[in-house]
Structures are given as C-alpha cells and as structure tokens.
Swiss-Prot record:
Gene that encodes it: TRMT112
Superkingdom of origin: Eukaryota
Species annotation: Homo sapiens (Human)
Residues the record lists as Phosphoserine modifications: 119, 125
Highest classification ranks of the organism: Eukaryota, Metazoa, Chordata, Craniata, Vertebrata
Keyword Cytoplasm: yes
Mutagenesis or variant effect for residue 107 to A: Abolishes interaction with BUD23, THUMPD2 and THUMPD3. Reduces interaction with TRMT11, N6AMT1, METTL5 and ALKBH8. Reduces expression of exogenous TRMT112
Protein name, UniProt field: Multifunctional methyltransferase subunit TRM112-like protein
Amino acid sequence: MKLLTHNLLSSHVRGVGSRGFPLRLQATEVRICPVEFNPNFVARMIPKVEWSAFLEAADNLRLIQVPKGPVEGYEENEEFLRTMHHLLLEVEVIEGTLQCPESGRMFPISRGIPNMLLSEEETES
C-alpha cells in the first residue's frame, strides 16, 4: 500500500463518520518499489494530501527528510516533487495494519493490499 493510498482511506465502521480518518498505520514490512517519476501527476496530487495524516504515517514508518508541507512554487520545484514522488508512490507497506482512530477496528494489510471489508454488523445503514 502506497502512502498516497493511505492518505485517501478512512474507516466506515457504523457510527464513526468523519472521525474514521486518519487511519493509524503500523507496518511490519516496508519496501521501496521504484516507480517512474511523473512530475505532473505528483504536482496534481500535492493539494489532495492531508498533511497531518501524511506526516503521522511517515513518522510511524520512521521516514526521514519528510517535507512538513508543500513548498511555495512546488509545481516547478523538481527536488520537492521527486521527494514527494518517493514518499507517496515508492514507499510501500507490504504487511501491517490500519487502525480506526474512533472505533479501534484493525484492518490488515497483506501483500500490499489493505482489507477494509466490514462485517454486516459494522456497516452503516
């Protein structure tokens, strides 16, 4: 699971609502998986990043040199875009868990895929 994906996921356990974000990330296996650099794509994703969730996830993974927010003129700043490309798209959680901050519900990550399926009792009606 890429950090970009993590930044978009939230819990939909019944009664949680908007308090199901951000999911707490705990990884037992992380890999760096090279991806072709696409500065236009990264620049388009920057405004969508929820920075507090991103920084918390990066801290949980013990990543270093993580920008605290978008730099001015980031669209033309190749160094910033490459750093964000690496963090959002190349750092992959292979095994671990995501935890709902409100309900405590754990969602497993297996082979890079987060399992967000809920039982019928957990779903919102």
